[in-house]
Design a protein with these regions (language model features):
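Conserved, structured core segments of small domains
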Residues: 1-112
């Protein structure tokens, strides 16, 4: 059964800290691979943290092993971004879908 997992990836040995993520070597191949994972429904959310040396992914997969096997196919898997941690994630709040409040016309936040 598919479950949500949070993946933290950290910069690898070929990461150039003087360059932004989009200017790292072999960026087009990595970006294309990751876009494919989004299209396949594997990656739900993802992106770099502010330091751009770490990336967080929320994925939907059957197991940690499946996540590792999938990410090993990334052209950056050992050179630019290595898997640091993979943790199961229980989603309690999900704003990706219309909330019952929005459906009832109560779109403003109760605290803002």
């Amino acid at each position: 059964m598919a479950t949500f997992l949070v993946v933290l990836r950290r910069s690898g040995p070929q990461w150039d800290p003087s360059r932004p993520i989009e200017e790292q070597s072999d960026w087009p191949a990595h970006a294309s691979f990751m876009d494919g994972l989004v299209d396949a429904g594997f990656v739900v959310l993802g992106g770099p943290l502010a330091d751009e040396h770490r990336v967080v992914l929320a994925v939907e997969a059957d197991s940690e092993d499946a996540v590792r096997a999938t990410l090993m196919r990334d052209p950056w898997s050992e050179t630019h971004l290595r898997v640091d941690t993979i943790d199961p994630w229980t989603i309690r709040l999900d704003g990706r879908h219309a909330s019952p409040r929005a459906a009832r016309g109560m779109e403003s936040a109760p605290f803002g």
